Every structure is written in C-alpha cells, then in structure tokens.
Amino acid sequence: MEFSIDNNINDGAVIKVIGVGGGGGNAVNRMIEENVKGVEFITANTDVQALKNSKAETVIQLGPKYTRGLGAGSQPEVGQKAAEESEQALREALDGADMIFITAGMGGGTGTGAAPIVAGIAKELGALTVGVVTRPFTFEGPKRGRFAAEGIARLKENVDTLLIISNNRLLEVVDKKTPMLEAFREADNVLRQGVQGISDLITAPGYVNLDFADVKTVMENQGTALMGIGVASGEERVIEATKKAISSPLLETSIDGAEQVLLNITGGLDMTLFEAQDASDIVANAATGDVNIILGTSINEEMGDEIRVTVIATGIDESKKERKSSRPARQTQMQSSTQKTVLDMDQAKPISAEEENSSFGDWDIRREQNVRPRVEETNFEPIEKKEFDTFNREETKAKGDDELSTPPFFRSK
C-alpha cells in the first residue's frame, strides 16, 4: 500500500512576528538583519515615517484617520483607538498563523495601547499568542513606568505566554562604554533567540522529535514565561550551555517555579545520552519539584564540538514561588513546637563571630524559650519565704544557740 502526503493540507506551522510601535518595529528590523528564517515579519505603527524605515514584508499604518500618520504622542489611549480603527487590516495580516509573536516597547503610546488589541485579534484567530515586551528604564520617569505597568497587565490578559525584558538590567549586563545600539541589540536577542529556537524546533527533524503540538502544550495559557538558548563546547559543554539557557539576565523572571519546560538539545555525532540526562537534571533542579519536562534531541553534524540547549519554561507564578519558599519555614516552626524541651546546652547551635561580637552576646530568644525550667521542676529554698515562717526564727536567734537547740514544746513549759 502506498501513502502520499498532501503538502497543500499542511506545510508546517506558520509563525508570524509583529512589531507594534517604534520599539517593536526596531526589534523586527534587527531580527531581519540577523537573517532569522522560517517566520513572517509584520510591522504596525501610527508613525508613517517609522514605517518607511521598516524592513518587514508587511507594514500596517494604525489609525490613519485618527492619527493621520503622526504617531500616538506617547498616549496609550491614542494607540488603542488607532489599533481599533485598523482592526480589519490587522486581522487580514495575522490570519493563517499558527503562532504569533507580538513585540513592543511598553510605556509609550502605540506599543502600550495597541499591543493588547493586536493580541486579542491573534487569540480570536486561534493562534498561539506570545508577547515579548520591554519595560522602560527607571530614569524615563514614573509616568512612563505607570503606563508600562498598565499596558503589560492588559497584554497579559490576551496572550498565552508573556516575556518581560527589563531595560534597567541592561545597565547591569553591558559595559559603560557599550554603544546604545549595541546595548539594545542585547535586549532584542531575547526575542530573536526565542523565535529562532521555536522555529528550529518545529522545522528541523530531531532524533527525539519535538513539534508544534509540544510547543503548544508548554506555552498555551501559561502566563509568564522564560525562553533561552545556550551554546558551549568543551568537557563541561552541556552544563554550561544549559545554565546559559535558563539564566537570561534581562528577563524579569527565572525558571524557579516553572511547571512546564520544553527542552531541546542539539549536538554533533559525539553527543551522549548522559549529556541529555545532565541537561534535564539541571532544568529539573532549577524548576519546581513536579515540573513537566518535554525533551527533544537533534543531531547536527555541523555543530562539531558544540552543544546547543534550547529551553522554554512556562507556568511561572511569583505567588507560587513565595508559597514554596515559605513552606519549609512553617514546617520547621511546627516541628519545633511539637518537640520536647531539651536543656542540654551542649546541643545548642554554634555561635558565629558576628553573634559573638553582638551586644546581646550569645543570647537567643529561641533558646531562651526552650531552656526556661518548668515550675514543677523548681526547688524553692525556705529562705525565700521568711515572711511566712511560723516559727519566727529571727526572734529566736538572739536568745542563743542553746535555746535554739531546744524544741519549742519544752521551752513553753
């Protein structure tokens, strides 16, 4: 029996990237310059001049009647109304996509106001929708920061997963002499790596294969996410590559607390089974105890001695991380409250040099509670109750030792 594949039915998952506003358009241009393959690029903006500089194959002017091509003036409500005016054009451009990345800079007018509208349209079309946005620098002012926070909150309601890049962290990872364009390229690399990584997962066949269905399982309706790629060579290559992939210094979240992880390892013919195990162990230890890891491996002879690790982690919830970190403390308190009091001070915790130099010395309120003796174990000396002495010993002391040695019964005779 012969089987045939109809390429007209499904030619693979369609991925589209739309940059909204000035920041989003710049990110798309840099991705095109980096020759990212397997995706379609779209740029949408209220500013006609910015659209003229776009390298995307599809450009959309947002709100031509409302803004007349002059931009949103840093007002998110203007960007929102412009996107609503151009909803039909956006819908036509996004239609047919299986996965849509929406990238924008938060805090301004067009990106902040229009990105949530674009995300809503993408979700209505049934596409897996991922937002990748930047939060402005603190020195850009509190008003811009407030606009960004509001825009991120609205966007999060309309996307499956969201990656937030903190511009403030650029100041921590780049040198003071680093040119501005190069610094912003570092932020755009987060988007580029995520898009390229997912595109490669879907299009490149693997020995243990991953497909778009796996990507959808990990990313659909999962909230905050982390995406990263790490490449390394040498003896500890898989360890170094995995740590790079899960440690993105620009993202506002970490893999700690992730519930779903898609892990793909690509290497040459010398890649071993134990290296795949090491990568999986590192990811599992960094995430939650019950993390679901979907593992894929690919052999690429062109990799040589290098190994590339791609990680997509989702379901990251800050409140879960807080509950997880506070749980051991509560358990310790419960255990200590049920334990029997121990008075052997040799078992006390050693005192550090800092505690020894403290004005409180080695006093510890936790030990104080434990070493305080119970009332029933205390022996009271008669001297403590002199005022209740019925024999009136203070008066008899002056009468001499002989009289003290005589019992009161005979002295009364």
Curated annotation (Swiss-Prot):
Keywords: Cell cycle, Cell division, Cytoplasm, GTP-binding, Nucleotide-binding, Septation. One of its GO terms (cellular component) is cytoplasm. GTP binds at residues 22-26, 109-111, 140, 144, 188. It is found in: Cytoplasm. GO terms for molecular function: GTP binding; GTPase activity. Residues 374-402 have a biased composition (Basic and acidic residues). Residues 318-344, 374-413 are annotated as: Disordered. GO terms for biological process: division septum assembly; FtsZ-dependent cytokinesis; protein polymerization. PANTHER family: CELL DIVISION PROTEIN FTSZ-RELATED, MITOCHONDRIAL DIVISION PROTEIN FSZA. Belongs to the FtsZ family. Essential cell division protein that forms a contractile ring structure (Z ring) at the future cell division site. The regulation of the ring assembly controls the timing and the location of cell division. One of the functions of the FtsZ ring is to recruit other cell division proteins to the septum to produce a new cell wall between the dividing cells. Binds GTP and shows GTPase activity. This is Cell division protein FtsZ. It comes from Enterococcus hirae. The gene is ftsZ.
